[in-house]
Amino acid sequence: MTIYSKIIGTGSYLPPNRVTNQELTAQLASNGIETSDEWIVSRSGISARHYADAGVQSSDLAVEAAKRALEMAKLGVDDVDLIILATSTPDFFGGFPSTACVVQRKLGITNDCAAVDVQAVCSGFVYAVSIADNFIKAGTHKNVLVIGAEVFSRIIDFEDRTTCVLFGDGAGAVLMTASQEPGVLATKLHANGNYGDILCLPGKVSKGVVEGSAFLYMDGPAVFKLAVSVLDKVAHEALEIAGMQSSEVDWIIPHQANIRIMQSTAKKLGLGMDKMIVTVDQHGNTSAASIPMALDVGVRDGRIKPGQNVMMEGVGGGFTWGAVLARM
């Protein structure tokens, strides 16, 4: 009997502090940084973002999204036998204990299930789903909780208008389970460390002292050029693995980073924007959280229906990129 992995629950969470472009523009202006709603929207498509309050960690956002995914899947916390959490903003400096372990504790899971973090920045969720898919198909795990959670507001430089207007905080989650029905149809992952310096957090720690910048750095034009190229290729690779054509894709959910990159992705696949779930305008770039958040929106508002084929693709620092083609 062939075992497949299938997404049976989705969930998402945004912290309540919503900051519009107008509000952020006013805040930046008070510090001598000039920008405008028109400038932000024209370059990114972003109208607002959400920021976590002080003391709220990635794990707190992750727990809320996970609860909603479990509720949709009609599973209890101790039905989970593996947690894979994608984040670039872990609860603890240095990354341990892992944020996945913190989420396990906060959810009240008592079965000693495996828990691990994945770090591939904005590609993290796609990487995590691919890992979960392989664990399930191998028969070692049945119910896997996959989460993307970020508090990027902690690592952006509010004196750099080219990046501080783009990012926000949030979390998204899916519950993947073993199934006799096809679910995940194909996954494909890539990385190229030669491009590591175009999107990075360059600071290093030596004996408790940060050497270099502790804020995110991004070469916007270089990221745009590379992202458009690799997203097109990896989507077609996933389709080839599944033996499908782009016309069979019902919905495309790219990493919600920049509307211009997303438009280019749809065009190169020969799909209209009416086939794309777009949420970037409401929460900005939430890194590893953006794809599962958009997926959850599409499922809950009824656009994404059972049996439909969804292409999810991400690109992020490292440089990393990947795609997942799944039947819902």
UniProtKB/Swiss-Prot annotation:
Enzyme type, top EC level: transferase
Protein keywords: Acyltransferase, Cytoplasm, Fatty acid biosynthesis, Fatty acid metabolism, Lipid biosynthesis, Lipid metabolism, Multifunctional enzyme, Transferase
Annotated segments matching region ACP-binding: 256-260
Reactions accelerated catalytically: malonyl-[ACP] + acetyl-CoA + H(+) = 3-oxobutanoyl-[ACP] + CO2 + CoA
GO MF assignments: 3-oxoacyl-[acyl-carrier-protein] synthase activity; beta-ketoacyl-acyl-carrier-protein synthase III activity
EC number(s) from the headed UniProt entry: 2.3.1.180
Catalytic residues (positions): C122, H255, N285
Domain of life: Bacteria
GO biological process: fatty acid biosynthetic process
This protein's GO CC annotations: cytoplasm
Subcellular location: Cytoplasm
Alphabetical list of CDD domains matching this protein: KAS_III (cd00830)
Pathways involved: Lipid metabolism; fatty acid biosynthesis
PANTHER family from the UniProt entry: 3-OXOACYL-[ACYL-CARRIER-PROTEIN] SYNTHASE (PTHR43091), BETA-KETOACYL-[ACYL-CARRIER-PROTEIN] SYNTHASE III, CHLOROPLASTIC (PTHR43091:SF1)
Subunit organization: Homodimer.
Family named by the database record: Belongs to the thiolase-like superfamily. FabH family.
Job description of the protein: Catalyzes the condensation reaction of fatty acid synthesis by the addition to an acyl acceptor of two carbons from malonyl-ACP. Catalyzes the first condensation reaction which initiates fatty acid synthesis and may therefore play a role in governing the total rate of fatty acid production. Possesses both acetoacetyl-ACP synthase and acetyl transacylase activities. Its substrate specificity determines the biosynthesis of branched-chain and/or straight-chain of fatty acids.
Description of its domains: The last Arg residue of the ACP-binding site is essential for the weak association between ACP/AcpP and FabH.
Protein name, as recorded: Beta-ketoacyl-[acyl-carrier-protein] synthase III
Native source species: Janthinobacterium sp. (strain Marseille) (Minibacterium massiliensis)
